[in-house]
């Protein structure tokens, strides 16, 4: 039983990045934009997260370094996604082609940058300050479920919370309704005054 619990816990922990990416893809798809550049966003986000955390650690931020790395991943993923958004929404580029270009650009540019920044090394140095698993008191003691869900990294808990938040925003708020309307019926949404391109 412990083996299964550990296996499921590991699956949950390592799927955290995929959950973040999937939520971003969900918003994009719901707004009517095909986004196959998610892999590129993940690659660029992972790279800039590691670089930001490395320099933050070198600057003496200590335990805050991984959190700053997480913010760095978010910011640079926003930059890459903005390229995709401008190309598809403003200039009407083919969404599949744009996403493919983002994937290629992210893979190539990050590989080049890591070699340039770290003197020819193909990877970033190992960080001292990293996220550690957090045990939630009492809940961790629940048989099986406690080991699976309540023994994870802070980012895993954030990802699970965001699933609930995104669901509520999409299906329980006017903003979510507008977002879904521009994806499903953009002409009808425009007729009632929703700014389709701005929403996307």
Where do the protein language model's features map onto the residues?
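Extracellular/periplasmic helix-loop junction at the C-terminal end of a transmembrane helix
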Residues: 107-145
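Hydrophobic alpha-helical transmembrane segments
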Residues: 7-11, 40, 44, 67-75, ...
């Amino acid at each position: 039983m412990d083996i299964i619990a550990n296996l499921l816990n590991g699956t949950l922990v390592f799927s955290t990045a995929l959950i973040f990416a999937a939520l971003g893809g969900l918003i994009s798809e719901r707004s009517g934009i095909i986004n196959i550049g998610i892999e590129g966003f993940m690659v660029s986000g992972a790279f800039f997260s590691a670089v930001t955390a490395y320099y933050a650690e070198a600057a003496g931020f200590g335990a805050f370094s991984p959190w700053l790395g997480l913010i760095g991943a978010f910011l640079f993923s926003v930059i890459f996604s903005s390229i995709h958004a401008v190309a598809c929404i403003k200039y009407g580029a083919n969404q599949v082609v744009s996403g493919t270009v983002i994937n290629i650009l992210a893979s190539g540019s990050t590989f080049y940058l890591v070699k340039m920044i770290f003197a020819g090394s193909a990877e970033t140095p190992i960080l001292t300050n990293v996220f550690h698993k957090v045990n939630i008191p009492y809940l961790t003691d629940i048989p099986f479920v406690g080991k699976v869900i309540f023994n994870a990294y802070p980012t895993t808990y954030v990802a699970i919370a965001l699933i609930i938040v995104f669901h509520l925003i999409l299906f329980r708020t006017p903003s979510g309704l507008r977002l879904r309307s521009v994806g499903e019926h953009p002409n009808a949404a425009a007729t009632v005054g929703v700014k389709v391109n701005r929403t996307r």
